[in-house]
């Protein structure tokens, strides 16, 4: 997916071209300021934080691969944080080589309306984006609301090794792409995730939402060779949380080869899993969609599951509507590379979906007239 260009800065702009200048600009940023980073490879000496409202940190060129913030020489396990501010935008740059968290959202300090757009998140060995727990005191006011993670590429060159992270608590499997708690009204869309894998293939989700996350939309993402594709919830509960995800929707996503689960829902309420395409005919766990424990009001509809299908381990009554379970390898454009667009051979999916008012477009934002099952709508029928 191609990101739209950022608008020109409205407030003051600061141009930086050295590591020292970048660190100073971030830590001294004033509200409304734009920090434009010249093309280059910046070995960060330590963790830094944005702490002012409406700050934009971006590459000057708009080319995300030309500005690299590298944590390989930092003594800290985290690279770039956001604290006690609203309206921050981080865009058009790369972060890489971080032991723990690449982008750290200090959610307990009242971080709101953060946008991370058109970034590359590369070789981050715990979480590419981490939003931490929010304490009970004032939680409803300070939980992170209205954030957006869009048009980013998350990828690792190889599975995680124990040597990458001495703090790993899961035998080398403590790894995910995005992991956020107590989120509300987020949009996670148009991202690509490749190779987010633990040392034994038991990592967390490429996208992992939990701890009373509410009304979030996860759509038009492409996930390839990650241990778990999309994870709504977790078997572990604490802090008096009854449901991990409430009123969230996952729609129009492509997921290819996610051996632990393509999409898993655990302790959810009124969530919807709609029009996703999941391809993993050799799935070792046979759970392209997995539902576990309570999933009250869950709707799983019009998903194309190219492989062994679903595993329902839930105690709740779930609506399963119009899902197609069949190896569709020969009906996709290029399934080996994760391109799950339909071809004319997908006769069992074309025009066979139940019309849903929640999904009027497909993964390419093409209008669904007579809807097809899965994330793609074949236009030339």
What are the functions of these language-model segments?
Residues 3-43, 47, 347, 361-364, ...:
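Acidic Gly/Asp/Thr-rich repetitive segments characteristic of extracellular carbohydrate-active
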Residues 10-23, 36, 51-100, 326-330:
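Right-handed parallel beta-helix/beta-spiral solenoid domain characteristic of secreted/periplasmic
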Residues 70-81, 97-108, 123-141, 162-180, ...:
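Extracellular beta-strand/beta-solenoid scaffold signature
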